[in-house]
Amino acid sequence: MKRKEFLEVSGVFLAGSMLRDAAAPELFTWNGALDIDARIYELRLKHAWTLSRGTWNVRRNVLVRIRREGISGYGESAPIPRYGESAESGLAFLEKARPILEKDIWAYRDRWREIDALAEGEHAVKAALDMAILDWICKKLRLPLHLFLGLDKGRIPATTLSIGIDAIPEMQERVREAADFPVLKIKVGTKDDRAIIEGIRKVTDKPLRTDANEGWKRREEALEMINWMAGMGVEFVEQPMPAAMIEDYVWLKDRVKIPVIADESLMKAADIPSIARGFHGINIKLMKCGGIQEAVRMAAVARAFDLKVMLGCMVETSAGIAAAAAVSPLVDYADLDGNLLIANDPFTGLQTIRGKVVLTDKPGLGVETGFWRD
């Protein structure tokens, strides 16, 4: 990692503690528990969402609110079934975490470590608690989250809009609807991938990125498809093969014409050293790694291994996307469109304009909701 990059990432970790040292001591007095509420919320997708491993019309997320002194901090969990998570398991984990949240949340790093140690998994609900705590702290300080992290909102990369697997005419129509986005992400990993990309190319000449979601099972197949896609204007491919095929990824890395980005092959910063030799970059997701703090650590470790960094998302509301967007000045590529895929976003205040998520100077995440009426 270059000295400049190290200092930038170090600044992210130092920013919160410096603010605490500089502010009036009484601001940080902690003498009572938070009110904590979490509820399942069904997200209705605008279009059926199909990947190489399934189709969904509805996703069940968990919305979290912590409240104290008239200030609400919001968080969101988008459970990942691949890792054994569900909305119900997230609620059960949150009950285990309640005693930790009765402690001083100004010591938010300690609280996150204690929450993380409660169980190996449940990263999505850990992310919800992490973002809710930081949203509350930032609102108390009257600071937007990106400034609390020491990051410049002017460095946010453009986000892709994802096109799920569908009949080619429907995918072409989704491309037309994405006219404001400079780069598109196309889901692949099927027997019809060539026809899909050729069909997309009939209606746009924009740069493309593809995501196979582990859909290609042989390295020779992956190599052939990736190098063919390179000639079709595809910039990089995410997770072409199953995560367990690490030696095949090492073989593939030396032979492909465009970068291969790891997604399902890793979850947290500790996973990066073991997979770095097989990839050109990584995809960080708050729901996969456990929250904002771990995402920042992952970006730092990835840079140390000279890897490109992408920030992705699940199907989420504007709360989850706002949290990820605050971290996005640290990364090279962004795929933060989860809120644009749903028809019933309960949060307001976040905009995506000409393919960029717009961070405001409102405190915390910068989003509001009428989901809680009190």
Regions found by a protein language model. Name each.
Residues 3-25:
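N-terminal export signals
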Residues 8-11, 28-45, 61, 69, ...:
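Flexible C-terminal active-site loop/helix
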Residues 30-38, 54, 67, 72-140:
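Metal- or metallocofactor-binding catalytic centers and their adjacent structured scaffolds
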Residues 42-50, 233:
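Short Pro/Gly-enriched beta-strand edge/turn motifs at strand-loop
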Residues 64, 70, 129, 142, ...:
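Conserved, mostly hydrophobic/aromatic
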Residues 145-256:
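Metal-dependent enolase-superfamily TIM-barrel catalytic cores that perform enediolate-based chemistry
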Residues 225-237, 276-282, 326-347:
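Structural recognition of alpha->loop->beta junctions
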Residues 244-249, 255-261, 265-336:
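Catalytic alpha/beta core domains of metabolic enzymes, predominantly
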